[in-house]
């Protein structure tokens, strides 16, 4: 049966609970334990699938088609354990489940209340798969004191009471602000945060304190005294140059040992951190630099493309180079010539997105890359824009576009080389969708198999003609235009197994021009860079004349 670590936050949000959880998971793995990480979000959305990227950042999609918080991406990248639908839940999902049960009569006419019905639903979620791993790490979103988070805090308090003594511990992450005028780290906000946590019945076993620099022993002792934790369980979490330093940094601070001590696991297996030393070496000792332009729609918030940024870093590590990314708003190219903006880059990446805004700019970026022989990677919408660009400029389909952008019924503005996907095969059954279906959870989501053309560039990159990648889209390139486009050099090099859905296109006689309908960034890891990103950076490296 698993041991449970509940990770909570205080003082301010966005302190890095997800990274701390992921790093702890990696350290426990390094000691030979199996782990699974979960995220419990207090917001009332059922999932992040319909939330604006500006509100929430990227949506991380799992193999089984769940749309989840970006922290699950950190969990996967640090542990290599594929996340599942049962690793993410929100207040919206919990309340929805409770109300469905009430409508079915499952509660036998009782008055439905937060305690016990909502808290029991949360506890049931936490318990899923508890016999599968040695450690279950559960991160609670938000900060202690948030109204919407109270049912989750109450649920984990009860959970700790329900389990045998020594099977659950609580780790609290806080901020130690530095006051420049006095030259001091202030512990009072952390003391009040722990006081708030204790007032609802949760006493932290481990205290992780974010700070700009080292925490003097005097402050550690003070925190241990006033927060009622052991001095060795006050862990400093200093700002780092790279998130991939976190496992080694937390190990030096003794986080993994503090957790094992809290569980009375002694003697503890020694960690094998070889892989993380190699990762750190590749980050800190690059042999060159490449410049990549990311032409997107949500560039004001880098978290909107979090997995893409990390996958590029992984590609750089595979090639021993530093990837310097510059985010460019695609709308700029709708007003200005893209050449002065793009000619300085070694490669161009156009990521996914929804809606018409900025798409003409993305098309111009694809055109620049194709005509100037610059490596191009188009992901999801980025592939669709590359296909539209080729259709407009290489064939007689000069009005090529996407059904997504034809808003008025009966008034077609484009020849729809990209159409609304209404049916597809998933496993052994057919999935059907209607245009007026709910937006949430109705896209083509999760892992699907693709067949690659033997001898194609992508088949060489993958080293296989069969791949499985994660998808998140409701629009698709129309297969009826394949012959027309292939005659002009746009090769359809990857297809769904039934041959109906284009998955990958590549430009013939181009050094590196690939568009993919799926999201390869979701499966990249620092110790196992995704082959597409590794080869994309290799191509950029050649352009930069580093080879």
Curated annotation (Swiss-Prot):
One of its GO terms (molecular function) is metal ion binding. Signal peptide: none annotated. It catalyses: UTP + L-glutamine + ATP + H2O = CTP + L-glutamate + ADP + phosphate + 2 H(+); L-glutamine + H2O = L-glutamate + NH4(+); UTP + NH4(+) + ATP = CTP + ADP + phosphate + 2 H(+). CTP binds at residues 13, 146-148, 186-191, 222. Allosterically activated by GTP, when glutamine is the substrate; GTP has no effect on the reaction when ammonia is the substrate. The allosteric effector GTP functions by stabilizing the protein conformation that binds the tetrahedral intermediate(s) formed during glutamine hydrolysis. Inhibited by the product CTP, via allosteric rather than competitive inhibition. Residues 291-546 form the Glutamine amidotransferase type-1 domain. Mg(2+) binds at residues 71, 139. The active site is at 380 (nucleophile), 519, 521. One of its GO terms (cellular component) is cytosol. Catalyzes the ATP-dependent amination of UTP to CTP with either L-glutamine or ammonia as the source of nitrogen. Regulates intracellular CTP levels through interactions with the four ribonucleotide triphosphates. Belongs to the CTP synthase family. This is CTP synthase.
């Amino acid at each position: 049966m698993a041991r449970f670590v509940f990770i909570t936050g205080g003082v301010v949000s966005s302190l890095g609970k997800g990274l701390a959880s992921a790093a702890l998971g990696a350290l426990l793995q390094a000691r030979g334990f199996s782990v699974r990480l979960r995220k419990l979000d207090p917001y009332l959305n059922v999932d992040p699938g319909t939330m604006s990227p500006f509100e929430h950042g990227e949506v991380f999609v799992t193999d089984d088609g769940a749309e989840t918080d970006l922290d699950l991406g950190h969990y996967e990248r640090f542990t290599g354990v594929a996340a599942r639908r049962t690793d993410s839940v929100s207040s919206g999902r919990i309340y929805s489940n409770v109300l469905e049960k009430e409508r079915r009569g499952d509660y036998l006419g009782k008055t439905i209340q937060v305690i016990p019905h909502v808290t029991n639903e949360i506890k049931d979620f936490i318990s899923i798969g508890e016999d599968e791993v040695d450690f279950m790490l559960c991160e609670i979103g938000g900060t202690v004191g948030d109204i919407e988070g109270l049912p989750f805090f109450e649920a984990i308090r009860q959970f700790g009471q329900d389990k045998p003594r020594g099977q659950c511990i609580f780790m609290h992450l806080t901020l130690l602000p530095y006051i420049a005028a006095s030259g001091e780290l202030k512990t009072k906000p952390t003391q009040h945060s722990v006081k708030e946590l204790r007032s609802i019945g949760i006493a932290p076993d481990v205290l992780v304190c974010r700070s700009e620099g080292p925490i003097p022993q005097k402050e550690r002792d003070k925190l241990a005294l006033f927060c009622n934790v052991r001095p060795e369980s006050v862990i400093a979490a200093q700002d780092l140059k790279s998130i991939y330093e976190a496992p080694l940094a937390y190990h030096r601070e003794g986080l993994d040992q503090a957790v094992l001590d809290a569980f009375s696991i002694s003697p503890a297996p020694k960690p094998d951190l070889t892989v993380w030393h190699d990762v750190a070496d590749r980050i800190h000792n690059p042999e060159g630099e490449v410049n990549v332009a990311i032409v997107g729609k949500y560039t004001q918030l880098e978290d909107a493309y979090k997995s893409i940024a990390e996958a590029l870093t992984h590609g750089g590590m595979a090639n021993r180079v530093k990837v310097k990314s510059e985010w460019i708003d695609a709308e700029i190219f709708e007003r200005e010539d893209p050449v002065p903006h793009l000619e300085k880059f070694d490669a161009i990446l156009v990521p996914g997105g929804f809606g018409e805004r900025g798409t003409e700019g993305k098309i111009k970026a694809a055109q620049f890359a194709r005509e100037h022989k610059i490596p191009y990677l188009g992901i999801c919408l980025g592939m669709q824009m590359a296909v539209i660009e080729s259709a407009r400029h290489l064939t007689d389909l000069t009005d090529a576009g996407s059904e997504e952008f034809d808003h008025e019924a009966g008034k077609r503005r484009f020849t729809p080389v990209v159409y609304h996907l209404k049916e597809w095969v998933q496993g052994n059954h057919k999935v059907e969708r209607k245009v007026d279906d709910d937006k949430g959870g109705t896209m083509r989501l999760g892992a699907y198999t693709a067949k690659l053309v033997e001898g194609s560039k992508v088949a060489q990159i993958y080293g296989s003609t069969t791949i499985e990648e994660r998808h998140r889209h409701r629009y698709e390139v129309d297969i009826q235009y394949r012959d027309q486009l292939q005659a002009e050099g746009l090769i359809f090099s990857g297809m769904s197994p039934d041959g109906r859905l284009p998955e990958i296109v590549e430009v013939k006689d181009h050094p590196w021009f690939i568009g993919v309908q799926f999201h390869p960034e979701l499966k990249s890891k620092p110790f196992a860079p995704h082959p597409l990103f590794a080869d994309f950076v290799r191509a950029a490296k050649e352009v930069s004349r580093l080879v």
